């Protein structure tokens, strides 16, 4: 008993320590850093910030301690509201999230590289949108009928919105990463229903039980019956009985594919689809012109739909899906129905809604508002992709890259593995990080073999060597020395200056060249007929520009500057009056 040893952990000490630190922060006791966000000052302790955020850890560990004064840090990316919630979390371990600040907090957390807060905001958004991402969940949708009257259209519209919230394309289920062992994992949303002909078709015998032949849109085009073939579907999914149909017939939510006749035509081999439980077979009888059909129902506006450019006279049978329909096709239709509902076209909603339907409409409007908030911050969140590592890749799992919130094939997961130890830069490949590190170390490993100039990238050095290997050279008309740069011999594109170097011009050799005119006995050709080739090409100023304007990275200057030079020097110059050699050669210097 005398040698007894026990390692005890008292969890209350954590809360007590955070409470004391928070009180010190609120009273400004021992605060050694001030964080300025949007003009608002937040006092804090460096140790707490450094221990909570990888951004502050990188920032404060690289800065040498020069004085005992408080450090002032300016954060221009994040907002004051978002940073206040984050700094309160650092000192209390409690994160206050609301529908108003979740986007700002998520953006600030991604910038500060706090993956725990990013994941919490991610879960909060999923819970707010009531999204389920269970892979084995079976979605049963109530069947409804699209009637001709406005009241039945309104009921169908509300039912579609409420049923589609669980499969909204905004938070579509992600697929497995395309390359889990590579440098990045990119998962795309299922592109169901976005184009025709995605489903495979196989021969099937006609049967009276699975045919819904009642046309839903009147028109000149005659459509054949719609047939649905189900494979690998257990009867237990339906509870031993079929789903109740609404009124006269079942309405299936599926886009039909055009066909030339009644017979079933196989279109090709089976494709790799996410939902392989069903194989749907749909045929139509269309006119000889085989016009493209429009997927827009008659009770919805066609002006704001993505398919509005198609033939407005073409009709299409749209039927409500059972649980065997593919998830992607239902997602697209519900997205379009929800967009039509929330797009401001009140004339299509018919008479006033019942209280239950009114609540559903308000709930759908709240979802749309949150979606708009996400889209407004999407560009800002995309800028933070570089500062995230493997732990923070879920931030961009459900955020589309495109500008449209309903682009089903634009969902991407961003994962970057290699991080810079000096700044927040991260890269997907080690070679990119190695090249980035040269900006911190000043290393230039690629020297020019001719002139010794060094470059950070090999391609810049190769482009620079073209200056030395080019055929265009400039020869002084007096001493016949060869120069690589036109400026060395006083040649500029579009000017009247002759090929005389600075040394020869200083000895007074340019006087007779200037007064000689063109081609006479005083011209350069007459004075120096064969001393060396004069290879100036006035139509190609690029060689001079590459030598004179190439910066540290080997980048050539803008062509606009050359054009301005040309305009300047093509303008007539007043001849200098005779009166001394200094005045005669002033324009040569």
Curated annotation (Swiss-Prot):
Q: Where is the composition biased (Acidic residues)?
A: 546-570
Where composition is biased (Polar residues), the residues are 305-325
| Tagged with keyword Cell membrane | no
Q: Which UniProt keywords apply?
A: Isopeptide bond, Metal-binding, Nucleus, Phosphoprotein, Repeat, Transcription, Transcription regulation, Ubl conjugation, Zinc, Zinc-finger
Q: Coiled coil where?
A: none
Does this UniProt record's set of keywords contain Protein biosynthesis?
no
**Molecular function via GO:** DNA-binding transcription factor activity, RNA polymerase II-specific; DNA-binding transcription repressor activity, RNA polymerase II-specific; transcription cis-regulatory region binding; zinc ion binding
Q: Which residues carry this modification: Phosphoserine?
A: 234
**Record-level GO BP terms:** granulocyte differentiation; macrophage differentiation; negative regulation of dendritic cell differentiation; negative regulation of granulocyte differentiation; negative regulation of leukocyte activation; negative regulation of macrophage differentiation; negative regulation of monocyte differentiation; negative regulation of transcription by RNA polymerase II
Protein name, entry field: Zinc finger and BTB domain-containing protein 46
Question: What PROSITE patterns does this protein map onto?
Answer: BTB, ZINC_FINGER_C2H2_1, ZINC_FINGER_C2H2_2
Q: Where is this cross-link: Glycyl lysine isopeptide (Lys-Gly) (interchain with G-Cter in SUMO2)?
A: 229
Record's GO cellular component terms:
chromatin; nucleus
Summary of the function given for this chain in its UniProt record: Functions as a transcriptional repressor for PRDM1.
Check the record and name the SMART domains matching this protein. Answer: BTB (SM00225), ZnF_C2H2 (SM00355)
Q: Which organism is it from?
A: Homo sapiens (Human)
Pfam families tied to this protein: BTB, zf-H2C2_2
Instruction: State its location(s).
Output: Nucleus
* Mapped zinc finger ranges (C2H2-type): 418-436, 446-468
Q: Which CDD domains match?
A: BTB_POZ_ZBTB46 (cd18230)
Lineage top rank: taxon? Eukaryota
According to the record, the residues making up region (Disordered) are 173-330, 512-589
How would you describe the post-translational modification of this protein? Sumoylated. Desumoylation by DESI1 reverses transcriptional repression activity.
